[in-house]
Amino acid sequence: MADITIGVVVFPGSNCDHDTMHAVASFEGVKPVMLWHGSHDLQGAKAIILPGGFSYGDYLRAGSIARFSPIMQEVVDAAGKGLPVLGICNGFQVLLESGLLDGALSRNRDKKFLCRDTYIRPVNSNTMFTGLYREDEVLSIPIAHGEGNYFAPPEVIESLEEHDQVVFRYTDREGHVSDEANPNGSVGNIAGIMNRNGNVLGLMPHPERASEKLLGSEDGRRLFASLFRQL
């Protein structure tokens, strides 16, 4: 049986593509391939990952130029047909700019770049990305971003909550949602959301940086495992 192909998109300025490739390659029966930003070829990928970094130098606005790349034209079209797409950090920003997810990400409330471990809780374990998590567990997964402050109009937030599209929230070590546990000011402590169809997920924390013991946490590994078992 052939390995399942997972496409990892590479933009100019991506810097987590190799980390993501390494995490994906650690799963048996899964083969990561790099998808260059200037290509229209998804290479038969059964899922797409948009990794972290600073696509196109984050000029104008994080993710705003990447949305116009040839590869994103194909990703948007494929996502509309049900292809699973995961956006991590800058990848989340690209998903928002591309219209695959609702809302926007602005500068962190303290206007500083944040790079540290943080705690998040899966608040919806009934998705293709979170099926191996429990909703009462607390995950230790690092963040590294300057524009991670998620916001959207009240009616969008209400719709996200109503349709269980909020997937992760920032919490403290005990799993309590509070302003003190919110690293960047995101409305409702939102760390990750998905689309209405459930095949597109964006989150600011980096699961690929919490995917093996050597990194200090394996809490992010089950996100990839949850996705791959659905393919």
UniProtKB/Swiss-Prot annotation:
InterPro entries: Class_I_gatase-like (IPR029062), PRibForGlyAmidine_synth_PurQ (IPR010075)
PROSITE patterns the record matches: GATASE_TYPE_1
UniProt signal peptide: none
ATP-binding listed as a keyword: yes
GO cellular component: cytoplasm
Keyword ATP-binding: yes
This enzyme's EC code(s): 6.3.5.3, 3.5.1.2
Pathway: Purine metabolism; IMP biosynthesis via de novo pathway; 5-amino-1-(5-phospho-D-ribosyl)imidazole from N(2)-formyl-N(1)-(5-phospho-D-ribosyl)glycinamide: step 1/2
Coiled coil spans: none
Domain of life: Bacteria
Active site: 89, 206, 208
Residues covered by the Glutamine amidotransferase type-1 domain: 7-231
Functional note: Part of the phosphoribosylformylglycinamidine synthase complex involved in the purines biosynthetic pathway. Catalyzes the ATP-dependent conversion of formylglycinamide ribonucleotide (FGAR) and glutamine to yield formylglycinamidine ribonucleotide (FGAM) and glutamate. The FGAM synthase complex is composed of three subunits. PurQ produces an ammonia molecule by converting glutamine to glutamate. PurL transfers the ammonia molecule to FGAR to form FGAM in an ATP-dependent manner.
PANTHER family: PHOSPHORIBOSYLFORMYLGLYCINAMIDINE SYNTHASE SUBUNIT PURQ
Name of the protein described by the UniProt record: Phosphoribosylformylglycinamidine synthase subunit PurQ
Source species of the chain: Chlorobium luteolum (strain DSM 273 / BCRC 81028 / 2530) (Pelodictyon luteolum)
